[in-house]
Amino acid sequence: MEIFDKKGRLLFPDTERHRKMAAEKGILAQGKKILISQVFCSNGHPLVRPENPKFDQEPGIHLICEGNTFWQSVFLSPFQGDRQKQHKTDFKMGEILQIYCPECHVHFPKFAPHDCLPEAMYLALFLDQEANYYNTVCICNVWGCYSSFLRLAGEIFSEVRAQKSAR
């Protein structure tokens, strides 16, 4: 995205245009909360369905999480930054999980490393059915991680860049 026009003048963002583009991708503002209303696996299967358990009257994001000893359905809050989830049994704190689509069982692709554990990764969940990495939200694959909530891909790029420059 350009920040200057051809004559060198600063371009100001068209916030209404950005809001419309975000809404098309299922990102909606609800007061001070940001709702992610649609998420897909890399094969285009929807993870948010009306029958999913609700968080503040909005359906959660359905994932299958597999640890060392068992697997289960986990429903994440669809609100960015909200750590709530619904599940039957806790995994061991700090356990690395395999996370995949409940419909086709494809694993979510690795997006970027995370610093909570040496082998921790952010996994990409897509905001469109085309599996475009520019339109993703991410989750950490470590159970109980302090960042185990939805993060926008742009935030993760900034975080990784800051970590590398601090080294």
Over which residues does each language-model region extend?
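Short cysteine-rich clusters marking metal-coordination/redox-active sites
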Residues: 38-43, 101-104, 114-116, 140
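Flanking scaffold residues of small Cys/His-coordinated metal-binding clusters
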Residues: 32-36, 93-96, 106-111, 132-135, ...
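Short linker/helix segments within small regulatory modules
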Residues: 55-57, 89-96, 123-138
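Short functional micro-motifs and their immediate structural scaffolds
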Residues: 46-52, 106-110, 119-126, 145-150
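Short, Lys/Arg-rich amphipathic alpha-helical interaction segments
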Residues: 130-167
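A cross-kingdom feature marking solvent-exposed beta-strand/loop segments within repeated
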Residues: 20-26, 84-86, 118-132
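Cysteine-rich micro-motifs
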Residues: 56-71, 98-104, 133-147
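Short, intrinsically disordered terminal segments enriched in charged and Pro/Gly residues
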Residues: 1-37, 54-71, 76-91, 152-167
